[in-house]
């Protein structure tokens, strides 16, 4: 973190704390890992604010987030190595699973899982992957469930690979091994 000083005299909040530095990686809900490309002042609807300009990794998508709303929209730092251990424990643990939602309609499960992916909570994403993995052992997955599973896996793999400084293929193999041995 660093403080911004004096750059925008007259705004009254020049000393606001900026949590993300240009060039650093962060996580934006539902999009996954992003890189902070710039911090720019923009006037929108007559209000001047500072924005993070975020580029989604492995995508052409650019997102602008007001700095003062960054926390409320769920922009967060990439997970730590100790949090990776917690994610792997979630993926391994099959005994605590409340029924993997197999008895619910596909639409209800899909909405529930989508909401968890959009939350930006990496542990919820891990639960979604684990639940769908268990569900696929009991029945054939629908196309939508397969898409949700792929999205959850992708979000986990990208963030863990950044946190561990490993190639995505290595992390995918780690997660596949955990899911295969947890069945």
Question: Which residues does each predicted region cover?
Answer:
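Generic secretory/membrane-interface signal
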Residues: 7-8, 18, 139
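Protein maturation boundaries and topogenic segments
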Residues: 1-12, 172
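A positional/architectural concept
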Residues: 13-75
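Generic signature of intrinsically disordered, low-complexity segments enriched in small/polar residues
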Residues: 5, 23, 31, 48, ...
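Charge/polar-rich, low-complexity and marginally structured segments
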Residues: 68-183
């Amino acid at each position: 973190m660093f403080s911004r000083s004096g750059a925008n005299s007259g705004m009254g909040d020049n000393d606001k704390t900026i949590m993300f530095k240009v060039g650093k990686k962060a996580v934006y809900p539902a999009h996954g890992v992003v890189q902070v490309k710039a911090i720019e002042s923009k006037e929108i609807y007559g209000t001047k604010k500072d924005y993070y300009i975020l580029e989604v990794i492995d995508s052409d998508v650019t997102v602008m987030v007001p700095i003062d709303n960054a926390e409320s929209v769920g922009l967060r730092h990439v997970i730590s190595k100790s949090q990776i251990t917690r994610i792997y424990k979630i993926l391994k643990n099959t005994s605590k699973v409340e029924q993997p939602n197999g008895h619910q309609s596909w639409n209800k499960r899909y909405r529930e899982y989508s909401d968890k992916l959009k939350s930006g909570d990496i542990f919820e994403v891990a639960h979604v992957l684990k639940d769908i993995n268990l569900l696929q052992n009991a029945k054939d997955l629908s196309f939508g469930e397969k898409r949700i599973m792929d999205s959850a896996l992708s979000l986990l793999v990208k963030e863990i690979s950044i946190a561990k400084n490993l190639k995505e293929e290595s992390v995918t193999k780690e997660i596949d091994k955990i899911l295969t041995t947890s069945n």
